[in-house]
């Protein structure tokens, strides 16, 4: 009996070992299967060598790599006009530290450079002030051989009269100044610049803090050229503008959309991108091209004469404006795009992104919203009827005086 018991125990032990072996074999197969399944997911996870932003975006490699000795880059740019992850990607990919100062008006940037602000490598002048800065020797000619990224641009945005041959500038973004209003609160929407002088709009308006644009639209209401140098016409514009300014609740070039979204202003004048973003969050916001014609403009990159890190500046221009990087502007600051490569990259691209308000979407949907909106995709008749602000030469002090006196009244 004892022997039989021992035999039974031995048989039971052998059976347990067999079961254990089968279990281990099964677990090994499961482990291999999971690893194989995980392989597909791993392809979507950035490799250890990939450069990934704090938001989880995997940065593209440079399309136009170059040797750069400088370790920093100093930008002097418009407020809220460069996506943070665009800067972060450039820093990760290049190893160059980006320092950013901001301004709210071309005149602010011009004054600082004129006063000897020579620490900057790149600035963002709007078209009309480029010729003035060139004339005063504040900018250096660009070496186009170092800018292969120029191939990315729609030729409609190159070779403007303010910079023939793009000797000094490379396009950044374009757009319009036009009328904006909230359809839920404005019973009689304005159709012309002249309408903004109506008493019913007093205390409800927001205007850009932009002297040339505001004086320019005032000149248009009088039937004059936005670039007039005639002192008598400018005096007349000054008197008319003095009637308008007390009715303006807020002058803001940093974030005019904020007041429109919050309901602190019901109408006024603003830029393309600000109107588009306001409308995305508040659909009742409408954008109207005035009967006298909108103000047309283009912002550009330019290099100050004594830029201390020009090699880093060229690296920034080539990287930030390649198509798989500059698409970020469609998300954050959707103005009119001179960069055709970024539009081509975005079209039909199902990459998951967040919009400017943090809502999940795809890059293709951002493109569709851009291309289907008459705000960002400016209609041909609005361009034909529009006006570009130019350098007025010796008449500039007259414009400055008007703005200072009228706003200070």
Tell me the role of every PLM-derived stretch.
Residues 1-72:
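Short, low-complexity disordered leader/linker segments with a strong preference
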Residues 372-409:
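Conserved C-terminal helix/tail region of periplasmic/extracytoplasmic solute-binding proteins
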Residues 152, 234-243, 281-305:
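Periplasmic-binding protein-like
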Residues 129-132, 261, 267-284:
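A ligand-binding cleft/hinge motif common to bilobed small-molecule-binding domains
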Residues 48-132:
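Early extracytoplasmic/lumenal segment of secretory-pathway proteins
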Residues 73-84, 108, 119-120, 124-264:
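Extracytoplasmic ligand-binding site segments that recognize negatively charged/polar headgroups
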Residues 304-378:
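Mature extracytoplasmic/periplasmic domains
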Residues 178-185, 220-223, 297-312, 328-331:
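A bilobed periplasmic-binding-protein/Venus flytrap-type ligand-binding module shared by bacterial periplasmic
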């Amino acid at each position: 009996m004892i022997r039989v018991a021992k035999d039974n125990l031995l048989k039971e032990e052998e059976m347990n070992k067999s079961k254990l072996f089968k279990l281990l074999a099964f677990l090994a197969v499961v482990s291999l299967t999971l690893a194989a399944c995980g392989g597909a997911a791993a392809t979507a996870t950035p490799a250890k060598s990939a450069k990934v932003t704090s938001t989880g975006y995997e940065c593209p490699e440079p399309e136009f790599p170059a040797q750069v000795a400088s370790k920093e880059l100093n930008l002097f740019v418009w407020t809220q006009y460069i996506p943070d992850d665009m800067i972060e990607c450039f820093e990760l990919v290049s190893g160059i530290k980006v320092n950013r100062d901001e301004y709210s008006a071309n005149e602010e940037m011009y004054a600082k450079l004129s006063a000897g602000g020579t620490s900057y490598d790149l600035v963002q002048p709007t078209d009309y002030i480029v010729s003035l800065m060139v004339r005063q020797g504040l900018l250096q000619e660009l070496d186009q051989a170092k800018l292969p990224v120029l191939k990315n641009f729609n030729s409609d945005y190159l070779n403007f009269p303010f910079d023939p041959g793009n000797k000094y500038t490379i396009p950044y973004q374009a757009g319009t100044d036009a009328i904006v209003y909230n359809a839920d609160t404005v019973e009689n929407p304005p159709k012309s610049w002249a309408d903004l002088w109506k008493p019913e709009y007093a205390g409800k308006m927001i205007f850009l803090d932009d002297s040339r644009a505001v004086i320019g639209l005032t000149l248009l209401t009088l039937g004059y050229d936005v670039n007039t140098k005639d002192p008598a016409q400018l005096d007349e514009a000054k008197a008319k503008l003095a009637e308008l300014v007390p009715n303006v609740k807020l002058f803001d070039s940093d974030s005019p959309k904020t007041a429109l979204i919050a309901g602190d202003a019901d109408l006024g004048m603003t830029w393309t991108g600000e109107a588009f973003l306001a409308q995305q969050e508040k659909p009742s916001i409408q954008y109207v091209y005035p009967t006298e014609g909108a103000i047309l403009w283009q912002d550009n990159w330019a290099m100050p004469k004594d830029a201390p890190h020009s090699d880093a500046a060229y690296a920034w221009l080539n990287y930030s404006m390649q198509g798989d990087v500059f698409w970020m502007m469609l998300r954050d600051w959707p103005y009119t795009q001179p960069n055709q490569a970024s539009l081509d990259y975005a079209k039909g691209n199902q990459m998951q992104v967040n919009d400017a308000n943090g809502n999940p979407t795809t890059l293709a949907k951002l493109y569709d919203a851009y291309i289907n909106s008459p705000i960002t995709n400016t209609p041909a008749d609005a361009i034909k009827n529009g006006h570009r602000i130019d350098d007025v030469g010796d008449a500039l002090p007259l414009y400055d005086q008007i703005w200072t006196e009228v706003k200070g009244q």
